[in-house]
UniProtKB/Swiss-Prot annotation:
Protein name: Hemoglobin subunit alpha-D
Subunit: Heterotetramer of two alpha-D chains and two beta chains.
Family annotation (CDD domains): Hb-alpha-like
GO molecular function: haptoglobin binding; heme binding; iron ion binding; organic acid binding; oxygen binding; oxygen carrier activity; peroxidase activity
PROSITE patterns: GLOBIN
Entry keyword Transport: yes
Pfam families, per database record: Globin
Keyword field: Heme, Iron, Metal-binding, Oxygen transport, Transport
Species this protein is from: Cairina moschata
Length: 141
């Protein structure tokens, strides 16, 4: 699935994200809520206004989970098992939403990193986010 070159590029992208995890994670959530308003239904108790403490906090959690996945590229299923259980059994999030958030995270990366986000990095990170979304959806079967 992920080649050695993909893994190298994914780590390089994540190094560029360092220090901006909360910002990028919350911006990706905001973009998802705007582009796909149906996703708001999973956050009825959140203040969904831009920059709210709850969106920033959840954005930080999203970025932390992605950071954990980057550290565990060879074993994503194990690294994301608890998160998969939470979303499948407790929160019952429709797995299509993982792909929507992944797409929004890609937009955030491209917007913030600009030329530092090469087409090769984009392709590798897209494969990574697709793998993360697939792992998070595993428990639904």
């Amino acid at each position: 699935m992920l080649t050695a070159e993909d893994k190298k590029l994914i780590v390089q992208v994540w190094e560029k994200v360092a220090g901006h995890q909360e910002e990028f994670g919350s911006e990706a959530l905001q973009r998802m809520f705007l582009a796909y308003p149906q996703t708001k239904t999973y956050f009825p108790h959140f203040d969904l206004h831009p920059g709210s403490e709850q969106v920033r906090g959840h954005g930080k959690k999203v970025a932390a989970a992605l950071g954990n996945a980057v550290k565990s590229l060879d074993n994503l299923s194990q690294a994301l098992s608890e998160l998969s259980n939470l979303h499948a059994y407790n929160l019952r999030v429709d797995p299509v939403n993982f792909k929507l958030l992944a797409q929004c995270f890609q937009v955030v990366l491209a917007a913030h990193l600009g030329k530092d986000y090469s087409p090769e990095m984009h392709a590798a990170f897209d494969k990574f986010l697709s793998a993360v979304a697939a792992v998070l959806a595993e428990k639904y079967r």
